[in-house]
Amino acid sequence: MRVALKLAYIGTEFHGSQIQPSVETVEKELFKALRNLRIIESPKSANYICAGRTDAGVHALGQVIAFDTDRPNLAIPRIINSGLPPTIWVWAHAEVPYDFDARRHAVSRHYRYVISGEGYDISKMREASKLLLGTHDFENFSRSNGEKSTVRTLERINVRVDGDITKIDVVGNSFLWNMVRKIVTALSMIGKGVRDNDWLIQMLNPDIYEEGIEPAPAYGLTLMGVNYGEEINWIEDNYSIRRASDQNSKRILRYRVMAEVLEELIYHE
């Protein structure tokens, strides 16, 4: 049977999602758990495919993976989670066709970036985001990774404010390396008045204008989900969702305390 899983993780401790030698990655922990639980023998023999890799420090709520297994009764969230560290958890599973490709069959991907701080002109950021919608050459918004084409299509960009937090949601068919984080940098620069819409239009024409911009920090980015249309009937594991929510609530309390501690460590004249 071929199984698909929805996977979440806090990327802070990992050097990305894709397995690499000598460093901690999400897939390193995932493969270890799947092998130890005898769900798969190896990623290669199980035809393991991931919807898309995330960079070091990037988080996920709805990463999707798929693999073949002779033990589908074990390939369920609460069993797999027993072999994973608390910063990685599976929360939904589904039976899929043997030809299901988690990467190629994706209809769209949804990313969210969280910015802390005030002083952004949100109306300018929203107007600028409209220029990015549709199909464009995003070469100026990517880091070279051997891509054959840098043309991508963005379906939706939403900029909203929640207190002193600004959230930017980006939905598209696929994304280049660092593309979302560089889009966030561009919108932030416009929101601060450093650049304007004419500059953004130039950035979308790399044949006549080239400029490298730094990607926004990885810690603010989360892969929220991958959409496959009506192709998959997901079964959510309420126990795994509730357990992860409880753990994250405890993390939030700890981080709030740490934020106060750091405030105390700031030198005041």
Swiss-Prot record:
GO terms for molecular function: RNA binding; tRNA pseudouridine(38-40) synthase activity. Substrate binds at Y111. It catalyses: uridine(38/39/40) in tRNA = pseudouridine(38/39/40) in tRNA. Signal peptide: none annotated. The active site is at D55. Its EC number is 5.4.99.12. It comes from the Archaea. One of its GO terms (biological process) is tRNA pseudouridine synthesis. It holds the Pfam family PseudoU_synth_1. Keywords: Isomerase, tRNA processing. Belongs to the tRNA pseudouridine synthase TruA family. Formation of pseudouridine at positions 38, 39 and 40 in the anticodon stem and loop of transfer RNAs. This is tRNA pseudouridine synthase A. It comes from Methanosarcina mazei (strain ATCC BAA-159 / DSM 3647 / Goe1 / Go1 / JCM 11833 / OCM 88) (Methanosarcina frisia). The lineage of its organism: Archaea, Methanobacteriati, Methanobacteriota, Stenosarchaea group, Methanomicrobia.
